[in-house]
Regions:
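Gram-negative outer-membrane beta-barrel transporters
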Residues: 163, 167, 287-295, 311-422, ...
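Transmembrane beta-strands of outer-membrane beta-barrel pores
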Residues: 2, 31-33, 42-46, 86-90, ...
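Residues on the lipid-exposed face of transmembrane beta-strands in outer-membrane beta-barrel proteins
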Residues: 23-29, 66-72, 114-120, 158-162, ...
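Periplasmic-side early beta-strands and strand-to-turn transitions of outer-membrane beta-barrels
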Residues: 1-61
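C-terminal beta-signal and adjacent terminal beta-strands/loops
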Residues: 210-211, 223, 412-428, 432-486
Length: 486
């Protein structure tokens, strides 16, 4: 890619030119009661970048991903599954301040997951699954207070599926996790599904969740080569921001570095869901789901600083007591056997209980402009959590015109959302700055002929851009693609 530039700076580009390649290999093998699957993916990217006439550098990314799976089916009642996953992400960067000053950095992260599952089918209506797993993560990089960090955990799980009545089945599961740096956690879950009639079914579930901070949230130092934004981990934020400030790359520090003292805590949650599946006829299906999640120490992210080139820096933090609730609606319909239409909508309310209490107690104020008088924020003025839209809508239409060509159209609408607190009261209210609602649409036409697939398409059909808040939307992209099956 030659990159692109959305600003008027003659030297600095929004995204610098880069080169990349991807390789993928997959293998399947089956013999008697045994089956084996494996896949390997590699990715490499090289990019040169320029900050000004005297400051420039290069960035190299290498990724490796390996999946393996071994299945043993003893008989119709017993199955054993052994799965492994390994990934490695490596980033090397060289930065020249001038001809005599060179800074080098590296980031090398490895992750290994292994799981053994035993599935015992007691009878047609009852199944028992149990197993254990191992998780190991290793991170090596410079400019940390520890050059190498690691985390290991073991987990044990059990799940039982059965029927209460002929039309009502249930699933009970439990999981126990052991960590080397956090307290062990027990997480139960229960779900029940009822087939009310031939066209309507319901599902209710309740469960407890637990998630520790990963090293992406703790130590990540990533800049996206396409959109240009940066994401840095909680433990690395103070050091990285200080370095960027000393290089003159920070235009606005939104969050004080004092916010990154202490540790990022694990998050826990209690979740409740009530859903219905409705079939109006053979070609139309509706799914409606009501949900409520009560979360402690939610690990979230927000903008903490802006760069001199207008790009944003994100990092992670804890929210003490949070709830999310809303409704989800999805439908799929087939028209004339050739046209498939999918609709999706979500209404989301996501708020911080501490912020709600502060507003209720009259402790939160705001200004419309820096010189205007302050006024008290009311409960109706509180918008909610950062980077959450109240309304999301998506539409997909696919049309297969006999044997001639296929047309695919998709459109996604997102209502306004806030990325940062712009009036200094430490929460997102209706008087802060927002990213305006947007509509992104794509369309493509494909023609199949023997082993060839020719595609012509347009991404971001209506040419939506927001350079300041969403730099990864460069504008309308017109493309063509030829696939050859060998």
């Amino acid at each position: 890619s030659n990159g692109y530039d959305l600003n008027d700076d003659p030297i600095l580009n929004t995204v610098e030119p880069y080169k990349s390649y991807t390789g993928f290999l997959r293998h399947n093998f089956k013999k008697n009661k045994w089956s084996y699957f494996s896949s390997v993916r590699i990715y490499n990217e090289n990019q040169n970048f320029t900050l000004n006439e005297n400051s420039y550098g290069k960035n190299i990314i290498n990724e490796l991903g390996i999946n393996t799976s071994i299945n043993y089916i003893k008989n119709k009642n017993y199955k054993l599954i052994f799965e492994n996953y390994y990934t490695n992400y490596k980033n090397d960067e060289e930065f020249r301040l001038n001809q005599n000053s060179i800074e080098e950095s590296f980031f090398n992260q490895s992750l290994f997951k292994s799981e053994l599952r035993s599935i015992y089918t007691i009878n047609k209506k009852n199944t028992l699954t149990f197993g254990l797993g191992f998780y190991s993560e290793l991170l090596k990089r410079n400019n940390f207070n520890r050059e190498e960090v690691s985390q290991n955990s073991f987990n044990y799980f059990v799940q039982y599926e059965g029927f209460i009545f002929e039309n009502t089945n249930y699933v009970f599961g439990a999981r126990y996790d052991q960590y080397d740096e956090y307290e062990s956690e027990f997480s139960p879950r229960f779900a029940i599904r009822t087939q009310i009639n031939d066209n309507v079914s319901s599902k209710i579930s309740i469960g407890k969740g637990f998630k520790t901070p990963d090293y992406r949230q703790l130590y990540f130092n990533f800049s996206n080569s396409i959109s240009g934004y940066s994401v840095i981990g909680f433990n690395a934020a103070k050091e990285i921001i200080s370095n960027l400030q000393s290089l003159g790359q920070i235009s606005n520090l939104i969050i004080s570095q004092d916010e990154f003292e202490g540790k990022l805590k694990p998050e826990t949650s209690i979740s409740f869901n009530l859903g219905f599946n409705i079939k109006t006829n053979k070609s139309t299906v509706f799914d409606i789901n009501f949900f409520r999640n009560q979360i402690s120490n939610l690990i979230d992210y927000k903008i903490i600083a802006s760069k001199v080139n207008g790009q944003s820096i994100f990092s992670y933090y804890n929210l003490n007591k949070v709830y999310t609730q809303g409704i989800e609606f999805n439908s799929t319909s087939t028209v004339f056997n050739d046209i498939e239409i999918s609709l999706g909508y979500q209404f989301l309310e996501a708020k911080d209980n501490d912020s709600k209490n502060q507003i209720k107690n009259g402790e939160v104020f705001a200004r419309r402009t820096p010189s205007s008088p302050t006024f008290q924020i009311k409960p109706k003025d509180y918008f909610g959590l950062y980077n959450r839209s109240k309304h999301n809508f998506n539409l997909k239409i696919s049309y297969a015109f006999k044997d001639y060509f296929d047309i695919y159209f998709k459109s996604k609408y997102r209502s306004k959302y806030g990325l940062s607190d712009s009036n200094g009261n430490n929460l997102l209210d209706d008087f802060d700055d927002f990213v305006e609602s947007n509509l992104i649409s794509d369309i493509s036409i494909s023609k199949n002929y023997k082993n060839y697939i020719l595609t012509f398409g347009v991404e971001n059909l209506f040419d939506y851009t927001d350079r300041e808040n969403i730099p990864n939307y460069p504008g309308r992209i017109i493309y063509s693609k030829l696939n050859i099956k060998l």
